[in-house]
Amino acid sequence: MDIPHIPVLYNEVLETFKDINEGYIIDCTTGFAGHSSGLLNQNQNIKLICNDQDDEALAFSKKRLEKFENGVIFNKGNFEHVIETFKDYEIRGVLADIGVSSLQLDKLERGFGFESLTLDMRMNQNQSLDAATVVNTYSQTELERIFKDYGEVREYKKVASLIVNNRPFNSSKELADFLSKKMSKGKLHPATLPFQAIRIEVNDELGVLERLFDSLEKAKLKDCIVAIISFHSLEDRIVKNYFKKWSKSCICPDNVFRCECGNNHALGKIITKKPIIPTALEIKQNPRSRSSKLRVFKFD
């Protein structure tokens, strides 16, 4: 079958989970099953829980992994719920690749790309909120908020004002072309960060990621490796801060002179002191991997 996707940091992910010989690994964002197929080929003693909220991605991954049918459970849903759903299973690994999939980027009708003829950007196509609603109905103040907080757009007020005074916009292409004409040029396309902000708002991406971490903490997993691939600083900051929190033995307030908590609260240890990034060769072969970062934590 034609495989339309190159998984990011593929070898690094396989290396991360190579010593797991039993139990389940949850692939929170299965997509085209690039990582999942690699993990199953590497070690057929493990079983996988393949989760995705995209119907098309799940259908493809079921086809791709059919030879492993006895070792795979498929689940449709947002990854914020997957740990709670499978809390009674022996979970030994959790993988989340939280970027937009190639499936979503390359399909013009999904509205993620600059050439898309819709203004959608929903990862779950069953939800009601889409990019058109955000762009064409949000107040200028609301747009300023998302461009500042989710896109870190330097001229967030200008972008919001331009959109409000020139809407409605009917497609991502129309919006991208408009911003390209109106905004100053730099290393990035002028629509890159505004599109990121709109996409995060539509899919509540940062909230979903935080709720995944909260569910991992609540589950009290034992002897479990958690590997997260992020693609921008907002996501990476969340991953880094949770891992740092989980690795701390002392949870006393900073103003306490002497530890009073027992100094025994660490849930595990950070495996990657610095994030793993793609090699120059991988970036050349797959330019979309350029901004990816892999961080790994191990629950004791």
Swiss-Prot record:
Compartment annotation: Cytoplasm
Domain of life: Bacteria
Main location group: cytoplasm
Function: Specifically methylates the N4 position of cytidine in position 1402 (C1402) of 16S rRNA.
Cited InterPro entries: RsmH, SAM-dep_MeTrfase_MraW_recog, SAM-dependent_MTases_sf
NCBIfam families: 16S rRNA (cytosine(1402)-N(4))-methyltransferase RsmH
E.C. code: 2.1.1.199
UniProt keyword Transferase, yes or no: yes
Positions that bind S-adenosyl-L-methionine: 33-35, 52, 86, 97, 104
Family: Belongs to the methyltransferase superfamily. RsmH family.
Single Gene Ontology MF annotation: rRNA (cytosine-N4-)-methyltransferase activity
Keyword annotations from UniProtKB, A to Z: Cytoplasm, Methyltransferase, rRNA processing, S-adenosyl-L-methionine, Transferase
Name recorded for this polypeptide: Ribosomal RNA small subunit methyltransferase H
Cellular-component GO terms for this entry: cytoplasm
Name of the gene this protein is made from: rsmH
rRNA processing found in the keyword field: yes
Gene Ontology BP term (one): rRNA base methylation
Catalysed conversion reaction: cytidine(1402) in 16S rRNA + S-adenosyl-L-methionine = N(4)-methylcytidine(1402) in 16S rRNA + S-adenosyl-L-homocysteine + H(+)
